[in-house]
């Protein structure tokens, strides 16, 4: 079973939120909405199809965050000559997070600090 306003699929509940947030704020929001809640993750193409259909009902061709990211400081950087990176002068560290369009299930990345709509997923009870 799912809480009111959430939609069941398999053993999980899903809800689309129209209020744009940064990726980090959206993930925090999802964790506050339901026990075990997170930004949506996909375990199969069928699940992705279900979520795209769910988002298309409320949003048209919008950016929708999912729970996948590449945190900038977790990247392994290295020089092409194999030397260790012991000097850095980055202008600004930027993390990239993954989104999909409400019209298809193709994944794209963009800076996590930008705003997007989002889908929360939590275990059904």
Curated annotation (Swiss-Prot):
It is found in: Secreted. GO terms for molecular function: metal ion binding; toxin activity. Disulfide bonds join 2-13, 30-120, 97-112. Keywords: Blood coagulation cascade inhibiting toxin, Calcium, Disulfide bond, Hemostasis impairing toxin, Metal-binding, Secreted, Toxin. Ca(2+) binds at residues 41, 47. Residues 1-122 form the C-type lectin domain. InterPro entries: C-type_lectin-like, C-type_lectin-like/link_sf, C-type_lectin/snaclec_domain, C-type_lectin_CS, CTDL_fold. Transmembrane segments: none annotated. SMART domains: CLECT. One of its GO terms (cellular component) is extracellular region. Its main location: secreted. Anticoagulant protein which binds to coagulation factor IX (F9) and coagulation factor X (F10) in the presence of calcium. It may bind the gamma-carboxyglutamic acid-domain regions of factors with a 1 to 1 stoichiometry. The dissociation constant (K(d)) are 6.6 nM for factor IX (F9) and 125 nM for factor X (F10). Does not bind carbohydrates. This is Snaclec coagulation factor IX/factor X-binding protein subunit B.
